[in-house]
Amino acid sequence: MTTLLQLLSNYYKAKLDSERIYNEYVQSQYEFASLDKLNNNKGDPKKVVDETLFLQRQIAQLNKQLQLSFQENEKLLSVQKNQKALYQSKLSSKDAFIDDLKLKLKVEQISVDKHNKERTPSTGRDEQQRNSKAAHTSKPTIHLLSPIVNRDKPNNQTNDRGGNDPDSPTSQRRSRGLRSLLSSGKNTIFDSISKNLDDEINENAHIRNDTTSSKIAGKSPSRLSALQKSPELRKERNNMILKEHILRSKDDQNITSSRKLDNIELSSIGDSTAMTSRSSTVNANDILGNEENDGITKLKRVNKLTSSPVKRDCSTNKKRKLTKQRIATLPNSDEELSNNLNVDEFV
């Protein structure tokens, strides 16, 4: 029994000792935790002060950097303004130099043109002739109202629509016929002859005026005065011719009246003196009026012929161009005409 009791007593003693040790440990932990808290509360304001001081230093550095950057920007802006003014002055000087060169070139061109005009005064006429030739070539070709092939070929260079060349033999070429020509809307010689003639007359008149002006410009002032006086002299000559013509006609009438009186009896003359006198006066007045009208018309014709040499040339040019157009529209041979006038293509 003694051994069991001793064992129980030892057990409870050991248990009490263990609880006591545990309690002491817990108390010691609480004490350490409270001390740490107190220490932490004491160190916080120091850290805040340190951080604020550090931030203030950083702000001061940044302000210095900003001021430096502003100063650098101002310097760069001043440099840029100076460079801009310098380049603008250079550009203005170069522009003035270019304008001077242009003026010099214009003056030189004007002097060269004057020199060329003095040497060759007929350059304008040559240019107008070239322009008139270009206009003639650009005009549409005229064809007669007949199914003849290759009529609208300028200078025999373009090919036919069917792929036939104008230089190929007649057996290989195909005629298009009258219906195709009419449906294609081409002008016939009866449609466009008046327009072409008017254009040619106007062009010839311009060319003639240019030639006369160039001839007059090349003449001396004495010749110009003589030319200006020439129409007056012509008018005087024409008036003299008219007067001579009227006087001759009056003399002829007097001669014829005397011859008629020789054939008439005296009794009839005595009875019809009043009638003959009246009729003679009326006839004389009519004849004089007709003669004056004829003289005026002749004067007008003479003045037109003397003052306008362009119309003769225009009429001759008309006839020549009409003959050329008719010759151009005719076929080259009888074989072409027989090949072109196929009965199947008319139907």
UniProtKB/Swiss-Prot annotation:
Write the protein's name: Monopolin complex subunit LRS4
Please give one Pfam family short name. Answer: LRS4
Which top-level group of life is the source organism from?
A: Eukaryota
* One GO term describing the cellular component: nucleus
GO biological process entries: homologous chromosome segregation; meiotic chromosome segregation; protein localization to nucleolar rDNA repeats; rDNA chromatin condensation; rDNA heterochromatin formation; replication-born double-strand break repair via sister chromatid exchange; spindle attachment to meiosis I kinetochore
Q: Where in the cell is it found?
A: Nucleus, Nucleolus; Chromosome, Centromere
Residues with the Phosphoserine modification: 168, 230
Q: Where is the composition biased (Basic and acidic residues)?
A: 112-130
